[in-house]
Regions:
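Short, well-structured segments within or immediately adjacent to enzyme catalytic domains
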Residues: 1-127
């Protein structure tokens, strides 16, 4: 991951006060490293099923999700069918940011539909 990202700073949203206090400095296992801090140093969920063949799929987004009006209770979430993602008050006051697999970005939106990949469930990794 360090070869692709270049810096750990892009893993934390500047508006995410909780994660900002745990911001990783390096990708290693030092006390301030991402390996040590793990999810405490990441502000964004990742759609592990997104790929470049379906550019409309949501790839990443702000972690403070609401799904069917509820916050996820685990770090791994499987969503069948089409789902509406929304956000709670924690970071951007009921709004969120997402990037799709095609590189497009949606900023400060109140909700977005997330679709399955050819009728397969969507799996989200949520810090």
């Amino acid at each position: 991951m360090s070869n692709e990202l270049g810096s750990t700073k892009i893993l934390v949203c500047p508006a995410d006060a909780v994660r900002k206090t745990n911001e990783a400095i390096t990708f290693d296992s030092s006390p301030a490293g991402l390996i040590t801090l793990k999810n405490k140093a990441v502000s964004y969920f990742v759609n592990v099923d997104a790929n470049e063949t379906n550019g409309n799929m949501v790839l990443i987004g702000d972690r403070n999700l609401l799904i069917a009006g509820q916050s996820p209770t685990s770090t791994g979430l499987t969503l069948p069918g089409t789902n509406l993602l929304q956000w709670n008050h924690d970071i951007h006051k009921l709004r969120g940011n997402v990037a799709r697999a095609d590189g497009s970005v949606f900023s400060q939106i109140p909700s977005i539909q997330i679709w399955t990949n050819h009728n397969n469930p969507v799996r989200l990794a949520i810090p």
